[in-house]
A protein has these predicted regions:
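Adenosine-nucleotide cofactor-binding segment
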Residues: 196-199, 211-327
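C-terminal hydrophobic helical "lid"/dimerization subdomain
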Residues: 2-20, 254-255, 263-265, 303-306, ...
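Glycine-rich phosphate-binding loop and adjacent beta-alpha segment
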Residues: 2, 233, 245-285, 321-395, ...
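N-terminal Rossmann-fold NAD(P) dinucleotide-binding loop
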Residues: 203-204
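Short N-terminal strand-loop motif that marks the start
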Residues: 1-86, 149, 153, 258-260
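Glycine-rich helix-loop-beta junction characteristic of Rossmann-like nucleotide cofactor-binding loops
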Residues: 184-189, 309-310, 332
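NAD(P)H dinucleotide-binding glycine-rich loop of Rossmann-like/cofactor-binding domains
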Residues: 75, 114-197, 245-246
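Glycine-rich beta-strand-centered segment in the early N-terminal region that forms part
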Residues: 42-56, 70-121, 162-164
Length: 444
C-alpha cells in the first residue's frame, strides 16, 4: 500500500488564497536543446508539499531524453524538465498535510499512481496504468521532472530523512529502490551466489543489495574496467569480470581472462567479433562462452560450491543492461532451478534461447521501477551510516551492510544553468582528466 503523510509533528499550513511565484527550471525542448527558463509555481494545494530541490542525480533515461528527446519508444512531444532522483527541503505545506514541518529534509518518490485501481490496492502501484512519473514522456501533458528550483509534490510520496543521511545518498534512494525491488523479486537465500551484468549505478546498487540480502558471492560484469574495479574496491561486489568492448582490436578474446589479485578479471590477447555480426547460433555460442568465463572466477572455490553441479551456474542473475547478448549470457550463467531478474530496459524485441530456461526450470522475472521500497532504503542507509561513523563494517542481520553510497557521486555541478554540462559528462564513463564517471549530480 502507499505510504501516508501522517504523524505527530505539527504541520504549518498555508492559509488564504493560493499565490504564485517564479522559479528557474531547466527545460529540454529537443535533442541537446536545454534551456534555463522562468516558470510560475503556485502554493501547494491540498495534500501537497512544496520542496526546494537540493540534489538531483542524472539517470540513464535522462541522458537518453537529452540526446534524442526520447527514451526507447517514448518520444517527448512538448518541453520537458528532466530529473527524478532527487532530495530537498520542505519550504511550504499545503492544507490537510500532517507529519511535516518547514525545513524537513525529504527524498522524493516521483511516481504518482492513481491509488484506486486493483493493482494499486494490491500494493503493486508501480504497475498502475495511470501512473504519472516525473521526467517521463509517457503521460501527456508530461509530468515535469525535478530539475527546477522548487516543485509541489504529494506529501504521501515525500519521505522524511534522518539527519545522518546526506542529500546525495537521499537522491540515490531512487535507483537504490530499483535494486531493492529487484532483490525482493529474486528472494535469494542466505549463502546464495549472484551475478550482476552491468556496473552502472543500478548494477552497483543491485550488487550491494544482493550482498546485503545474504548472497555470499556477487560477481559483477561490465565492459568498463574502471567501474568493475570500483565495485570490488568499494565492497559492492566480491568478484569482477571485465568484458571486452566490441571492435577493440588489441586486448582480448572473450574466453581468455586472467583473475587478478583484486578479484577482477582482465583481458589477455585476441580479437573479439562484434555480436551484431554473428548468426543467432553463433551469438548463443558466444554468450555460452562468456557465461563460462564469468563462472570460472568462483567455480573452483570449495567455500562457494559444495558440489560440481552447483558450479554449473549462479543461483540468481540480475541483468541490468537490457542488451540481448547480456540476456543470453544471463540464461547460460544461471544454474538449473535458478532465477534471472530482468532489471535493465533495452532492446524491446529479443531472440532468446528459451529452451535453456524451459529445460532447466530457470525462472525469468521482470521488474519495473519499484514499490514499497523507500522506507527499507532509508533504514538500510541509516544502518550503514551508523556503522561507518562508528568505524565498523561487515554484516548486519543476514548479510553485509550497504557500502557508503555517497562515494558513487563522482561529479557535481552547481546551478541549473550548468545542466547541459552535467548531461554531457553523464553520457561518458571517464571525464576529460581520465577520472571515472559514475553518478553525476546537479545542485539547484
Amino acid at each position: 500500500m502507499a505510504p501516508c503523510a501522517t504523524g505527530e509533528s505539527a504541520a504549518m499550513h498555508l492559509a488564504g488564497a493560493s499565490k504564485t511565484s517564479t522559479i528557474n527550471a531547466s527545460v529540454l525542448h529537443g535533442p541537446r536543446d536545454l534551456r534555463l527558463e522562468r516558470r510560475t509555481i503556485e502554493d501547494p494545494s491540498i495534500g501537497e508539499l512544496q520542496v526546494a530541490i537540493h540534489t538531483t542525480g542524472i539517470c540513464g533515461s535522462d541522458v537518453s531524453y537529452y540526446k534524442k528527446f526520447a527514451n526507447g519508444d517514448l518520444c517527448a512531444c512538448m518541453p520537458l524538465s528532466l530529473g527524478h532522483e532527487s532530495s530537498g527541503v520542505v519550504v511550504a505545506i499545503g492544507p490537510q498535510v500532517t507529519g511535516f514541518n518547514l525545513g524537513d529534509r525529504v527524498a522524493l518518490e516521483v511516481g504518482i499512481p492513481c491509488g484506486q485501481c486493483g493493482i494499486c490496492r494490491k500494493g503493486r502501484y508501480n504497475l498502475c496504468k495511470r501512473m504519472k512519473f516525473r521526467s517521463s514522456a509517457k503521460s501527456v501533458p508530461h509530468f515535469q521532472g525535478t530539475l527546477q528550483e522548487r516543485i509541489n509534490h504529494p506529501a504521501t510520496w515525500c519521505h522524511k530523512l534522518p539527519d545522518n543521511i546526506s542529500f546525495d545518498a537521499a537522491a540515490l534512494l531512487e535507483p537504490l529502490s530499483v535494486a531493492i525491488h529487484a532483490v525482493n523479486r529474486a528472494e535469494p537465500t542466505p549463502g546464495s551466489s549472484a551475478l550482476v551484468i552491468g556496473a552502472g549505478a543500478v548494477g552497483l546498487l543491485t550488487a550491494a543489495m544482493a550482498r546485503q540480502s545474504g548472497c555470499s558471492t556477487v560477481t559483477i560484469a561490465d565492459v568498463d574496467q574502471g567501474r568493475v574495479e570500483f565495485a570490488i574496491a568499494k565492497g559492492f561486489a566480491t568478484h569482477g569480470y571485465v568484458v571486452e568492448r566490441p571492435l577493440h582490436s588489441s586486448p582480448s578474446c572473450s574466453s581468455m581472462y586472467s583473475p587478478s589479485s583484486s578479484g577482477t578479471s582482465t583481458p589477455l590477447d585476441g580479437v573479439m567479433t562484434p555480436a551484431s555480426t554473428l548468426s543467432v547460433s553463433s551469438q548463443f555460442d558466444y554468450a555460452r562462452s562468456l557465461a563460462a568465463d564469468m563462472l570460472s572466477l568462483t567455480a573452483s572455490d570449495p567455500s562457494i560450491y559444495s558440489d560440481e553441479e552447483e558450479a554449473d551456474g549462479v543461483d540468481v542473475t540480475f541483468e541490468c543492461t537490457g542488451k540481448e547478448v547480456c540476456m543470453h549470457t544471463s540464461l547460460y550463467a544461471t544454474r538449473a532451478g535458478g532465477k534471472v531478474i530482468m532489471v535493465g530496459m533495452g532492446t524491446p524485441v529479443q531472440t532468446i534461447p528459451m529452451s535453456v530456461a524451459h529445460l532447466r526450470e530457470i525462472d525469468i522475472l521482470g521488474i519495473f521501477r519499484y514499490a514499497n521500497t523507500y522506507v527499507t532504503g532509508i533504514k538500510l542507509l541509516c544502518a550503514s551510516e551508523r556503522a561507518r561513523k562508528a568505524g565498523k563494517a561487515g554484516v548486519s542481520g543476514g548479510g553485509c551492510l550497504l557500502p557508503f553510497l555517497d562515494q558513487m557521486v563522482t561529479h557535481r555541478f552547481k546551478g541549473l544553468e550548468n545542466a547541459d554540462r552535467a548531461f554531457e559528462l553523464a553520457s561518458k564513463t571517464v571525464d576529460p582528466e581520465g577520472k571515472l564517471v559514475l553518478k553525476v549530480v546537479i545542485e539547484a
